[in-house]
Amino acid sequence: FGPEGEWVVLPVGLDDAGWRKAHTDEIQYVNTRALEVIRELIGTSAREPVIILQADHGAMISDQQNHAEILNAYYLPGLIETGLYPTITPVNSFRLIFNNYFGGTYPLLEDATYMSYYDQPFEFKIMENNCP
């Protein structure tokens, strides 16, 4: 998508700068729509909702580390201590939420991000976690 939600056809052979621009344009549009939905959920829910907003991957550019950087945002009403930490990965998001809201006892798993290439989909590589 373009920044206003318009359909965009990307040319074949786009370089990293072109992918970054296309990714930024998509994010601008998605941010606008996501905020509308989140405001609606919070404003019309009879009970404060738990909201998790996650991306499955970052920008699809040649820098593999960018591919592993995702959005991981939470709205967790009523909790004084969430247990969230800067290096959390999605594998532990729901475990913490179930433990905090529903009395679960799910142990946390290793926070790891795996990547594979299209031509070798089952050859996984562990990505370094560069979260601050």
Predicted stretch roles:
Residues 1-132:
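Catalytic domains that recognize anionic headgroups
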